[in-house]
Amino acid sequence: SKEIIEGKEGDFQDEIRSLDSIAKTLRQKRLKNGAMNIESEEVRFVLDETGHTDSLIIKRSKDAHKLVEEYMLLANRLVATFVSKKKDKHNRIPFVYRCHDKPDQAKIELFSLFIKKFGYEIETNDPNRISNNINALLGDIRYKNEYSLIQSMAIRSMAKAVYETDNVGHYGLAFDFYTHFTSPIRRYADLVVHRVLQETLTSNKHRYGDELNDICKRISRMERKAVEAERESTKFFQTLFVVDKIGEEFDGTVSGIAEFGMFVKMDENQCEGMIPMQEIPGDRFRFDSDKFQIIGSKTGKTY
């Protein structure tokens, strides 16, 4: 489908292009309604026969991926909307919503102060416009060195998505109702949602009651653990990849700075490491928190 979307001929080309056109319309509508437009990259590892990292692949989202994503989002949204309108003898069907609250205003103000150090400003007074304003900023700086750092800080300023029985909507996707429905073989939340939907469509007798609150808390907690485990495993295999390359030179981009040094991410493989302040060559450097820069005492060189 990727090749057909990009203009080549193939089986079901008319159907695939129609699906792609609809997906792009759905995406444009979400963004117009205030959905966050975050570009992500995924690191994949190719292992040799001994289990060591042989090479890295950086996967970036293409139109074919976005096509699948939009229809998954549509299915999740429609299921949540459908069940939310149904009632049982208790007037409300217990359900697992995927919720993403509005960002905390204090965190947004900190983000605003942070980007001012790079010469950028966004309007933060209207909570309903914050996502649009951040999208516009990220679009303007897409090919600048500070893009990845500012996008990372924008994500950190947002609330964390969780599972709840009381729906508050999904801010990041600009949906009033949302759930996780499309992956019951790998997420317990989706399995619960399938059960509730099946019961709603048939008997309207539901096995879940107040215990669904505890289930939501548990799967939210386990999700955070899974994310942390994935992050640590990525770092582990990246370390295995570079451990035998000590002494080689790579192009990199500063991905973060702090009082004790700076973080640098290699451009070709996304491996990241920290350079202690005293080991930055060419000068004696200090951290300027007001300007969010590392500055050389003699040369005035900045990072």
Q: Which positions does each model-derived feature cover?
A:
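Conserved, carboxylate-rich catalytic/transport cores that coordinate ions
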Residues: 1-303
